[in-house]
């Protein structure tokens, strides 16, 4: 993936087949002050790929999240939804949020269907071969509430998100355990209503630091 994400409070999932389609970050965020998002995908192989993209709304990005109905048919749009991607080429996929401007955070699964162009062009008699040569990749898009309320509580090395939008939280400084070295860093996503305790950084130390991101705004906590 293009951006390394440390263990997340959000348990996002996705599969990126080796030497195939690179869809970038497993998790993407559309901040409350934006209604568009662009993702660049890349075909790192030496053959063309047929890419089809589908959107699903989820009740939660966690493992127990279920597919649910969108509030309206054009709640989230994308373009292009289908494309032929030449070898070693890239393409920008754009997403447009047109849903309710309320206080609710929304979660979507972007499903990328990727298959070698030679397989896609086979006749129906050989369609059974397509499934084994194809890949289904799932990534997550989080759309922050249009009316975001950022609130949190911090005490004794634990952060609680008391607002209505996911926070990116981090801690860095002396390691809590000597076996982990001298300096440690932790980086998580924290959903509304969830708490997270830092377990690698000694946040009680004077040199231990805790901070978070509210959208694009950096907030020192300790």
UniProtKB/Swiss-Prot annotation:
It comes from Escherichia coli O18:K1:H7 (strain IHE3034 / ExPEC). Residues 1-20 form the signal peptide. InterPro entries: EcpB_C, Ig-like_fold, PapD-like_sf. This is Probable fimbrial chaperone EcpB. Keywords: Chaperone, Fimbrium biogenesis, Signal. Part of the ecpRABCDE operon, which encodes the E.coli common pilus (ECP). ECP is found in both commensal and pathogenic strains and plays a dual role in early-stage biofilm development and host cell recognition. The keyword Nucleotidyltransferase does not apply. Disruption phenotype: Mutants do not express ECP and are defective in biofilm formation. Belongs to the EcpB/EcpE family. Induction: Negatively regulated by H-NS. Positively regulated by IHF and EcpR.
């Amino acid at each position: 993936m293009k951006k390394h994400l440390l263990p997340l409070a959000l348990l996002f999932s996705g599969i990126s087949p080796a030497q195939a389609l690179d869809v970038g970050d497993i998790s993407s965020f559309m901040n409350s002050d934006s209604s568009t998002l662009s993702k660049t995908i890349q075909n790192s192989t030496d053959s063309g790929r047929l890419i089809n993209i589908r959107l699903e709304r989820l009740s939660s990005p966690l493992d127990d999240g279920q597919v649910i109905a969108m509030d309206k048919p054009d709640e989230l749009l994308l373009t292009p939804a289908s494309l032929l991607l030449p070898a070693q080429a890239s393409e920008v996929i754009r997403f447009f949020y047109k849903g309710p401007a309320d206080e609710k955070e929304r979660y979507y699964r972007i499903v990328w269907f990727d298959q070698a162009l030679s397989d896609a062009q086979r006749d129906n008699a050989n369609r059974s071969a397509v499934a084994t040569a194809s890949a289904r990749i799932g990534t997550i898009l989080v759309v922050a509430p249009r009316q975001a309320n950022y609130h949190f509580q911090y005490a004794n090395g634990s952060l609680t998100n008391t607002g209505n939008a996911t926070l990116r939280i981090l801690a860095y400084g002396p390691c809590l355990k000597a076996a982990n070295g001298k300096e440690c860093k932790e980086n998580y996503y924290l959903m509304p209503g969830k708490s997270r305790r830092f377990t690698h950084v000694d946040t009680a130390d004077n040199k231990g630091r805790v901070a978070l991101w509210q959208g694009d705004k950096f907030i020192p906590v300790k």
